[in-house]
């Protein structure tokens, strides 16, 4: 396991992005917690979020797809 996937900054806040949202390159998509450190993961491209491929709170691995983004 590389880390834990979180869709929002806390349990009481809205997700950073939802399906159908427009995103810009560098925009925060989620947080990955690894070794008690919270790391924001940004989008590589401008586009539209088509799928969220990991469940909130799930353990994720290196190289595992987390989002499907249709590039603009």
Residues of each region from the PLM?
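Structured functional modules or segments
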Residues: 1-72
């Amino acid at each position: 396991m590389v880390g834990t996937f979180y869709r929002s900054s806390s349990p009481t806040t809205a997700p950073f992005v939802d399906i159908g949202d427009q995103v810009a390159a560098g925009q925060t998509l989620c947080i990955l917690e690894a070794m008690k450190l919270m790391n924001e993961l940004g989008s590589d491209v401008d586009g539209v979020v088509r799928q969220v491929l990991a469940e909130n709170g799930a353990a994720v691995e290196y190289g595992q797809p987390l989002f499907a983004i249709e590039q603009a």
